[in-house]
């Protein structure tokens, strides 16, 4: 389970290396980097992607050469890419080193901040025959982000708990992705000071911290879900401030993160209006 979560949640890292020229045969080894490649104007040059790369729609038709367990090293070499977009937090380092030994150019890309999304798009646009496509996409992202900041700017904080999985209960701590999305909307993470990036917690710990909002999976919120019996113990449940979020929007740092921001901010606004 933790391997799958790590594959879905990029850590902060990026390689600002410059392209020697336009790439013609590109392989992406993570879902978020596939989306960013399309934003950067590289979609028509992708020849293979990671197993969970399902957006945009045309990515589903591409050959799959990696997943949370590893990458298909021999197949990638056989495809003769002139650029691999790798993710050091999710792709095995030894296998990436082997790709480098074969002379395959690698762009290491895992952006874990809102500004980093735009920067990543700009950097990858350097590998496109039309870099202006990615530059425009990055500018539009920043403009929309600024508009959302003006719309939802507030110092009225809302405490929340974000549940990533049920068995075990995993959450996010510190400034690890997607914490910045919640902070952007005025959220205060009840596990912000956790020692691990994505710690395992107990129901008792959640009860003790009394979150005003609980973001959980649809299954966890069902009538017979894991939180049902704690309605009188957790403010979020007692006030019906329990919501599910689009996991792709919130967990992948891409242009669609703007949708996640709107979703989270609107939920927090609902809480503030009821106070």
UniProtKB/Swiss-Prot annotation:
Source organism superkingdom: Bacteria
Gene Ontology, cellular component aspect: periplasmic space
Gene Ontology biological-process entries: cellular response to iron ion; cobalamin transport
Domain Fe/B12 periplasmic-binding: 25-272
UniProt-annotated site: Important for BtuC binding, residues: 74, 204
InterPro entries: ABC_Transporter_SBP, ABC_transptr_periplasmic_BD, ABC_transptr_vit_B12-bd, Vit_B12_bind_prot
Disulfide bridge positions per record: 185-265
Any matching Pfam family: Peripla_BP_2
Keyword line: Disulfide bond, Periplasm, Signal, Transport
Residues spanning the signal sequence: 1-19
Family to which this protein belongs: Belongs to the BtuF family.
Known role: Part of the ABC transporter complex BtuCDF involved in vitamin B12 import. Binds vitamin B12 and delivers it to the periplasmic surface of BtuC.
Protein name stated in the entry: Vitamin B12-binding protein
């Amino acid at each position: 389970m933790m391997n799958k979560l790590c594959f879905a949640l990029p850590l902060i890292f990026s390689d600002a290396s410059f392209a020697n020229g336009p790439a013609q045969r590109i392989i992406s080894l993570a879902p978020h980097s596939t989306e960013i490649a399309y934003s950067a104007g590289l979609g028509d040059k992708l020849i293979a992607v990671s197993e969970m790369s399902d957006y945009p729609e045309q990515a589903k038709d591409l050959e799959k050469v990696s997943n949370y367990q590893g990458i298909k090293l021999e197949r990638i070499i056989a495809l003769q890419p002139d650029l691999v977009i790798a993710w050091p937090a999710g792709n095995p380092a030894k296998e990436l080193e082997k790709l480098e030994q074969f002379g395959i150019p690698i762009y290491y890309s895992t952006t874990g901040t809102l500004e980093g999304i735009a920067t990543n798009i700009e950097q990858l646009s350097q590998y496109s025959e039309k870099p202006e496509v990615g530059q425009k996409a990055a500018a539009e992202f920043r403009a929309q982000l600024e508009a959302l900041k003006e719309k939802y700017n507030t110092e009225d904080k809302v405490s929340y708990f974000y549940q990533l999985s049920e068995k075990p209960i995993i959450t996010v701590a510190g400034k690890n992705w997607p914490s910045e999305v919640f902070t952007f909307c005025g959220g205060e993470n009840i596990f912000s000071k956790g020692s691990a990036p994505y710690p395992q917690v107990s129901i008792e710990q959640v009860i003790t911290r009394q979150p005003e909002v609980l973001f959980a999976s649809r299954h966890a919120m069902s009538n017979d879900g894991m939180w049902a019996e704690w309605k009188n113990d957790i403010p979020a449940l007692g006030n019906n401030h329990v919501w599910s979020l689009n996991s792709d929007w919130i967990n992948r740092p891409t242009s669609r993160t703007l949708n996640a921001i709107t979703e989270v901010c609107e939920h927090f606004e609902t809480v503030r209006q009821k106070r």
